[in-house]
Every structure is written in C-alpha cells, then in structure tokens.
C-alpha cells in the first residue's frame, strides 16, 4: 500500500524492517509496536505519539539526524503511522 511505498522510498534507506528494508544507519523498526517510547525515550509510543513523532520529530528531539517530512501529506503520514504500529516480531 501507500504506507509501505512511502517507507521504502523515504525511510528504508536508514531504517531496517525485517522483510521490508535493510537500512542500518538508524534504529531497526522491526519491533516498533512493542516499544514503550520513541526517540530514545522522549515520547510515548502510542497512536498519538507516533503521529506527532512523524510530523514533528525535529521539534521533539532537537539535533536528530532524521530529515523532516514536510512534503509528505498528513494523511499519508497517518497511514505510515498505522502501518508502523503493526510492526512486531
């Protein structure tokens, strides 16, 4: 779907997801749904937190290397968040 394509194009170069991408420059997201927090503990890993993280991670954790996603529509970021919430081992 659209979320998987966005992940592949925009996230998979840095992030690994088992069976999807092999990025190794940023955290492995294969088990993201099982983690209590995002950004090394700076925000809760729940539906709202994940959407905030995808939309505004630069403000939440200053100096983070992950690029901004201003060019990705909010609806698509929401779909990406929904997909990421399913990732568990």
Please describe what each predicted stretch is.
Residues 13, 19-88:
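Extracytoplasmic electron-transfer domains, predominantly the class I c-type cytochrome c fold
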């Amino acid at each position: 779907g659209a979320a998987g394509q966005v992940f592949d194009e925009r996230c998979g170069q840095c992030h690994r997801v088992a069976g999807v991408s092999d990025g190794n420059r940023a955290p492995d997201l294969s088990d993201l749904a099982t983690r209590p927090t995002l950004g090394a503990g700076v925000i809760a890993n729940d539906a709202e937190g994940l959407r905030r993280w995808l939309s505004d991670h630069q403000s939440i954790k200053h100096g983070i290397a992950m690029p901004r996603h201003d060019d990705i529509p909010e609806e698509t970021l929401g779909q990406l968040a929904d997909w990421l919430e399913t990732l568990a081992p």
